[in-house]
């Protein structure tokens, strides 16, 4: 029997045995048994049809992304050397290696920066060439979970960066200043953010949306995006579309294009020298 239509059978035949009344359609049943007018019966049937999903068409299931991480190399010597040449503190490098946020790929010896979810499962991986200009992502990467280092305790502030290396550069400078680099949330945006032509129509980066949902106590967002036109425009766009409940601060690097330039300048590492060292290390392979 069809739900909501009494004694109407699926083959559209019905019989009210006590009254010796029968018919061949739901329309007959509603008029003869339920006492609806012709138009009322039509509207009722049409209304039920509108809310019932089609029987013959199955809803498509949203396929989940499967992250295909590059095979890990047994050592991380090239990656460690590469990051040290860029001024990153060894304590930070060891932390990332230990927590599964960083490793060296077996095939091309790329640096693999892994984004993990709250269950500590890998969901995203940024690839960075050691001694080359290669930049990419592992297949199946979910940008909602880009590289990050959450604060070790409750915190109301998150700092945003374009890349994992910029994030680690900022954390290194925090350590150089005698501060606890695990005191605040650190989040990368997995590359350059491209706003809409009309800034007010831009979307908040998916990784930031996810992060703010998972850390609802965050009240302040500090921008450390690049000191170029793209970085300045991205900062302006995101600040424009963020809900007004958040306080925002813009703190681009004081020297150079990005925070790694800033760090290297502070440490006296010239960019040409560190790039040359990385390239030489790459040729040694």
What do these predicted regions represent?
Residues 1-9:
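Single conserved hydrophobic/aromatic residue that forms the stacking wall/gate
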């Amino acid at each position: 029997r069809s739900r909501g239509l009494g004694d109407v059978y699926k083959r559209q035949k019905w019989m009210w045995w006590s009254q010796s009344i029968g018919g061949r359609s739901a329309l007959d049943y509603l008029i003869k048994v339920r006492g609806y007018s012709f138009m009322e019966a039509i509207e009722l049937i049409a209304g039920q049809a509108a809310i019932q999903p089609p029987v013959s068409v199955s809803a498509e299931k949203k396929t989940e992304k499967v992250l295909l991480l590059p095979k890990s190399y047994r050592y991380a010597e090239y990656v460690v050397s590469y990051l040290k040449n860029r001024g990153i503190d060894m304590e930070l490098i060891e932390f990332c290696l230990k927590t599964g946020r960083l490793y060296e790929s077996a095939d091309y010896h790329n640096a693999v920066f892994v984004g993990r979810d709250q269950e500590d499962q890998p969901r995203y991986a940024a690839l960075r060439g050691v001694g080359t200009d290669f930049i990419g992502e592992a297949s199946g990467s979910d940008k909602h979970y880009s590289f990050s280092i959450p604060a070790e305790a409750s915190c109301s502030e998150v700092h945003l960066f374009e890349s994992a290396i910029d994030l680690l550069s900022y954390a290194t400078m925090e350590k150089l200043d005698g501060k606890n680099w695990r005191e605040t949330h650190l989040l990368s945006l997995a590359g350059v953010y491209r706003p809409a032509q009309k800034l007010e129509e831009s979307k908040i980066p998916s990784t930031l949306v996810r992060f703010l949902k998972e850390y609802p106590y965050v009240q302040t967002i500090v921008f450390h995006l690049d000191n170029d036109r793209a970085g300045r425009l991205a900062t302006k766009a995101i600040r424009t579309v963020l809900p007004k409940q958040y306080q925002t601060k813009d703190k681009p690097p004081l020297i150079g294009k990005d925070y790694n330039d800033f760090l290297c300048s502070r440490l006296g590492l010239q960019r040409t020298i560190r790039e040359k060292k990385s390239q030489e290390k790459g040729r040694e392979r």
